[in-house]
Amino acid sequence: MLLGVALLAAPLRAQDVEQLQTDLVETFNTYSWGDARWGALVYSLDSGDTLLAIAPDSALAPASNLKLLTTAAALHRLGPDYRFHTYVLSDAPVRNGVLQGDLTLYGTGDPGISDRFYGRKDEVFQRLIDDLEAAGITGIDGDLIADASFFPGPLRDAGWERRDLNEHFTAGISALSYNENVVSFRIRPGQVGAPPRVETVPPHSALEVDNTAETVSGRARPRLAILRDDPVEPVRITGQIPSNSREVWRQMTVAVPADFVGASFRAALEGRGITVSGATRTVELPIESSVGRLSAPALGRPGARILARHTSRPLSDYLEVVNKESNNLFAEVIFRAVGRADSGVGSPEASADAVRRTLVALGVETTGLRQHDGSGLSSENRVSAATFVDLIRRMSDGPLWPEYWASLPRAGTRRELGRMYRTAAADNLRAKTGTIDGVSALSGMVRSRDGERLAFSLMVNGSPSQTRAKRVENQIGARLADFRRTPGTVPVIAEETAPPASRTTASNDRHRVNRGENLSEIARRYGVTINEILQVNPRVDRNRIVAGQWLEIPRQGGN
């Protein structure tokens, strides 16, 4: 199938550009695409040339490329230093160490309460309990309430494939999350004739389990199966497992994240000797919440007080999880947070409106845009290649580009975008991938051999082969990185991305952290103390600095 390509105006069609265009079209036409539809656009951010255009205005399903819209809107609407807060609240008095009433765990969406950023899965819970103990609380004479009413729901988008709802990438969206709303089933053989032993990691999953499986001495017929038709239904463990079998692991989403959080927090409390006399209850609707639809839970309730509070890492850290790891839960929660910040309602509809308004304010072309979720998992989403390229162009001209660029996966880099690792694109091209059934996409930016910044978006819907689509993306990315203009026609090239200007002061130097460095080494190099560095970097965690991070360094001799 020959793809139609929008040709450049005659004055721009230098021989080098014509050759590039020919090479790109030949790459597309290497394979037969049947009824598949491509949308592609390559645009020079430095010269303003459109180097390739294949149906760039066609609105296609973008898969995870949609995360580019979500994260851009989050940076503009929330800011890179935005934090999620989790509160422990009560309006009850404390007598002899016992809280005389209900205790509420109130979430505002933090998806990072897990071992992703901390030493253990329940470390955030333990820190909250530290604060309760410091307040002298040794017991709770009331209920434990897990309040997730900050977001109104639904837990899952109706456009997500039903067969995927057990998988980690469709974890339920909630204002309260723990362990990214998944548990791992660990199944070990029992005595012959008895059911296998079942546990979940972490425990207290709040999942109903129907274990009818059997441990056998010989071959398993039928083999062990761990099944669930819908997240709200019991997990069924059926079949047989040999007595000499290794343990079997299966990860599944929890049915209701707030139930999971409530059960897990209660277990953490009781593990520290803080007993709860009442039930564990879940609140998901604002109308049922004693906290109410407030952005700051301490406001609006006479006598209500914050007993403990956890503050998340900055949004900029979370955006790297979204774009580099394509984490859907983080994307969905951030999407809802954008809606909540914009209109006071964290529904999918309000959030989509907020994203669109942000894009329009940036001057991004949004014709054909249809957004149903924040992650791109829904097959009902629609975006054009022109919108993605226009977004990259607008972001690259703005003050938040360093944070946005830092969140994108680098080609040839393990655990980011491992493809194109032996090409000119390696450690140069940065782009978001996207894959759902029949859909493949890659959108981002790469520098040519001349250093020219080329924004691109490649999307295909109805692809008969994901492997072929990814191969085409790789070849095009590598070819763009290898592109060189005829001498004398190279446009003025923008400088390499600098760290955010807002984090610099005239009286301080700056240091970019190298691989393996720690604060002690950096302090010695500049002749300052660690505390002096931390004073001018109030958001830096002294126990976690990473390669590529920028630090302000106070100059010796004062201001």
Where are these predicted regions, by residue range?
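Conserved serine DD-peptidase/penicillin-binding transpeptidase domain
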Residues: 15-29, 77-366, 449, 483-486
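Soluble periplasmic/extracytoplasmic beta-strand elements of cell-envelope proteins
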Residues: 39-43, 51-53, 70, 87-89, ...
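Small-residue-rich helix-loop
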Residues: 51-54, 325, 332-500
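Residue-level preference for non-acidic, small/hydrophobic
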Residues: 48, 67-74, 144, 176, ...
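Bacterial N-terminal signal peptides
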Residues: 1-9
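Primarily a LysM-type cell-wall glycan-binding module
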Residues: 499-535, 547-549, 557-559
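Short active-site loop at a secondary-structure junction
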Residues: 53-73
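Beta-lactamase-like hydrolase cores
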Residues: 14-59, 131-136
